[in-house]
Amino acid sequence: LSEEEKFGEEIDGKQTFRRLAGTWTYWGWKHGYFASEEDAKAYFDEMCYMLAFQMVSPNSPQWFNTGLNWAYGIEGPAQGHYFVNPKTGDLERSVNAYEHPQPHACFIQSVSDDLVNEGGIMDLWTREARLFKFGSGTGSNFSKIRGDGEPLSGGGMSSGLMSFLRIGDRAAGAINSGGTTRRAAKMVSLDMDHPDIEAFIDWKLTEEEKVAALVSGSQHLQNHANEILAAIQAHPDEDSKFDQGKNRPLAKAISVAMQAYVPENIIARVLELGEQGYTHMDIETYDTSWEGEAYSTVSGQNSNNSVRVSNDFMQAVLNEDDWNLYWRTELDNAKEESREPSPCKSIPANDLWDKIAKAAWSCADPGLQYDTTVNEWHTCSPDGPINGSNPCSEYMFLDDTACNLASLNLVKFYNDETTKFDTEKYSHAIRLWTVALEISVLMAQFPSEAIAQRSYDYRTLGLGYANIGSLLMRMGIPYDDNRASAICGSLSSILGGVSYAASAEMSSVQGPFPRYKHNKDNMLRVMRNHRRAAYNAPSEEYEGLTVTPRGIDSNYCPEYLLSAAQKCWDQVVTEGEKHGFRNAQATVIAPTGTIGIVMDCDTTGIEPDFALVKFKTLAGGGMLRIINQSVPVALDRLGYDSVQSEEIVDYVIGTGTFSGAPGINRESLKRKGLTDDIIDSLESQISSFTSVGLLVTPSMVGTDFCVEKLRVKEEFVDNWNFDLLEHLGYTNEQINEANDYIFGRLTIEGAPHIKDSDLAVFDCANKCGKDGERFIHYMLSLIHI
């Protein structure tokens, strides 16, 4: 490359695709992953093709970091990373930032009950910062940290877990604002028997209540302060305006302020300002914007929080038993002395469960991680338990390991004409991307020695998919239907089976992951259980599970999908027994928030659509209204003709024009005094607005024109609460009719031609539009798990 090409920005998607595919191909070729140079070239071409056609996308750190050194020679100063040399197996320190990139999005890090030493609390914040800077996320289980008031070995009492979590939250928030690639992402998890579990459950709930208090309180302070000043200014007698006995409005304003809990020092300050001649007091007011000052003031806003729930705890809830909490030191001492630990506190399990429910209902945290079930499906349980997860909870494995993700866009493997899912193409893509993720482990660097070593030892991958909500809609199948559950199960089964089979194939050449021998029996047990799920085996056939999964129901699954799923898991078990596996884990289903946009997905991960119409904020300003691209395809699949489909889509998203609109249209606007040029300008910007009232405003029409031609008073043109449509004489009924016609109802309910029996196909996670009533009930989703 020329100097300009080497150090200029990437201006074409092809440059990025070649940077990524070229890096994977280079490392794979150099380390024996391809049988011939022709195979390597074919691999490069296929990977570029899949990226360009939005069939698959790797996780964000791959886009940020992979290939910057290989393609452009970019190095950068070392950032304290480590890697295992793939040729020697030796742990080495990275000499620059990009020769070994950081392609992993997901990390799980351990933290010990130590303040300043390596592996301890303050060291964790440094390791987290190293990850955030390069666009990755991390999670940790903080259950080893002593609780509030727990005795310290050197005397005194521990300040407790929450004090340290607040420090980590602040650190993440700072990087959040100044990071080089994306916002910080972290997961904080805690075992249910920790002494501080109650405070942890209520943490985010309490902090969000503080935000509400700041928002409401600041507005009240502003209002009451200025009501006091107004009472002072309105009193006619200058000498007695501060005398509450003679200025009764002032006395009332002060009394009302005190009843509203306005602090006395604020009231005193207002009176002093009044004495100095001030007529208005500016008090900083806050809003509920998540990027606003109120949220930045409180803690707990820079992480997802989860509690680790065991079967024992759930049984205690069902039995209405007490639940014991333990000092961390007591657990350690009891283990050393081979005795049962003594609890520091006992709480009714139902009280904790109610706390979790209330907090999650209020602020969506904490989430639940089912510790027993997770560990029963753990491929490497002899090497230790799974304690936590990455920020989005799709990756669960041993502490101090990492996972790099990629997701396949399922819609790209579905043929709308034949209404068949291409399992052969899907399987081929899974194989190629399993190789890409394995190569990414080979070339990667990591934020600590422990993570570098353990990622080399276990080589965990995270291949998944996205857009299943759109796929099901295109198939004409409701998301909460039994058929949807079976199809989702079969596609997930094929994903896991083909990926683990590819891992076994790589193991036959490259050897299994270094810790495989120690975990062989357990990993093969897990693989056999996956195979049983593909065959929908009876519960008693599963090995080592207390809660068995729902298998693929052959009554609802297309035979060709079921057969493909069963065939690949037969191969996994057979090949795994022969060769072992190159990777301790191969698949996850990630939320795909960012890469879902890259692949132009209508739905993310395994989720249904949350709304048929979305409003996308554009980087250059403005907003774009987008309908789920699968709606017209689904209507065709359900038998509606093109005219009917167009009318249904217009009902949902609107016509986007004044022409033909009831109530408010080109003709009526011209009669009200607007010119053709102004109407044309307004119509060109309809896609950036959500209602006629927000579109037809003095700022959009022109303030001078409003004053001179439409007779709007000057004091109104800058008033955000002024309604120009009302001023022009339009009624609420006319405005509502125009909104429905131009901007759409945002729901398919009530659309012309649509059959009631077809509505379920278009159901979303939320009610759609102001008139929508239907949504996917949360219990139906749970039933189909």
Which ranges hold each PLM region?
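Extended catalytic cores of very large enzyme megasubunits
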Residues: 1-783
